[in-house]
């Protein structure tokens, strides 16, 4: 919250593009959506348009997730990411062994996070903050 309106550009350096670029740089991130995202894509425009309710530009809803046409609109930035499960698990798996030239059992040793999603939340929030700072600096 507290993001000013007018950060971003309509093309290439849109607020969504800059944020998504940073988020997809986080290992394990496989998807990014803004506002009502993929669910909103199933609805009609008349059902999900964010109605402006006053001269300051406040909206009744925030289906766009704080960004319209690539530019922040003053609403809260709402972004969600999908993080893949960690592949380094303690269960035996089967995979190709290049030394032996065949599919063989693999057991990953050492200490690994069973779930990276909890740690990813802090990193995702930081990346969004850095993205917004970058957009603010581009304003001049």
Language-model features, listed with the residues they occupy:
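Internal helix-turn-beta structural module
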Residues: 78, 86-140
